[in-house]
Amino acid sequence: MEIIRLQTLAESLGLILKIQMRETLGLNFFRVVVAEQNNNYVKIWGEMKGWTLPYKKGLQLDTLKVLRNSPPLISELIWAATMAWALENTPCRSARLLAIYDQEGYSKKLVRYFRKMGFYIIKEVGSNPGDLFLRLIWGGAGTLMRGECKSILKRMEVKFEKLNLI
């Protein structure tokens, strides 16, 4: 599924799908946004932020935010657009993220959610001296996970097909 098809799908749902990118020192920082526009007012319902390195395992997902009262399929559009963008525009074929230890019990929910999306656990990042570099990159401790871009995109495509949206 291509970005252009996802943008058309978003439009059919009354939404706007945008991808912003900037390059700094060989890193491509990106932001995927799903919003709704009414007259001159834009409401951002959700976004994904991250960066890419120029290799197959280079997609790094940093922030996923979806508002609680958002319309249906916001997170699915964000995931699909992020994976489609990476596959179309970068050499990245897998994504990495950290389910950060924020609140008691919330980390387990994040890990469960990311597993449903198609991610698997690489390792627990904690207070071990060997984890210092990863803690600096991700800004904390948590569960480091990886997922394959094609399979995550396919999961979203199957969901859209089941809802007769594509």
Which sequence ranges carry the predicted segments?
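Non-catalytic substrate-recognition and accessory regions of acyl/acetyltransferase enzymes
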Residues: 1-73, 80-99, 103, 107-120, ...
